[in-house]
């Protein structure tokens, strides 16, 4: 087993509650967008992703010839509320939450409808071959990505120890209610790329990153009535009002 015989610096970031996406760029041009899917194969959603205004179709500055940018497609609260109000007016079932709405939207056949729903996207990880990586740290790579035109969250911090990490988590556990989009936790990553190489991966995930999930928000509600709907095959489903 390998160990890191030096101090470790971490980057703490918001864990966006949306749809994971991989963006491929060649010679500064956006060429493909694929959902995460089962981890090895996802859906090609390039045409729909092109409608998201904060995803650059052409990069600026000094960028690598070929790389992938991982990110999250989200639906802001303002868009979510507007879409659900419109669906209710049309007698359609409203979306349960912004994540489901974003997931359904990027798979629509009509790109014009996707554009009208005003999705956002945040980038959080740059992927390229190790021998072509031009940065020493994760934080440096995201700072460069922002210069090239990517939308990178400003809500991240370099943490030197456990106390710094706990402070970041506690702060955003309180402040998340004020954000214009949903988050469901904090992602903690080792900042230095060489240290990441030493730590490596398990069969399912990197050893240099971990997600802290917030507790689900709780609220009181009142049950007014229960309707019973009968399906085509005679299945009876209770529906609470």
Regions found by a protein language model. Give the residues of each.
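RNA/tRNA-interacting regions in translation and RNA-turnover enzymes
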Residues: 1-241
């Amino acid at each position: 087993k390998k160990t890191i015989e030096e101090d470790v610096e971490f980057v703490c970031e918001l864990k966006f509650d949306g749809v994971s996406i991989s963006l491929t760029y060649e010679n500064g041009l956006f060429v493909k967008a694929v959902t995460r899917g089962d981890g090895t194969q996802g859906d090609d959603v390039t045409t729909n992703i092109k409608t998201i205004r904060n995803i650059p179709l052409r990069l600026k500055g000094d960028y690598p010839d070929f790389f992938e940018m991982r990110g999250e497609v989200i639906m802001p609260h303002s868009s979510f509320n507007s879409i659900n109000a419109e669906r209710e007016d049309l007698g359609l079932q409203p979306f349960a939450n912004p994540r489901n709405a974003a997931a359904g939207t990027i798979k629509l056949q009509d790109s014009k409808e996707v554009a009208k729903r005003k999705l956002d996207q945040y980038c959080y990880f740059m992927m390229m071959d190790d021998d072509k990586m031009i940065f020493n740290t994760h934080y440096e790579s995201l700072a460069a990505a922002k210069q090239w035109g990517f939308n990178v969250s400003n809500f991240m911090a370099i943490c030197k120890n456990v106390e710094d990490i706990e402070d970041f988590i506690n702060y955003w556990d309180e402040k998340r209610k004020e954000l214009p989009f949903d988050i469901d936790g904090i992602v903690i990553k080792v900042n230095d790329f060489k240290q990441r190489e030493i730590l490596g991966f398990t069969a399912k995930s990197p050893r240099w990153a971990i997600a802290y999930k917030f507790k689900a928000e709780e609220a009181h509600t009142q049950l007014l009535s229960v309707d019973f709907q009968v399906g085509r095959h005679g299945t009876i489903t209770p529906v609470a009002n």
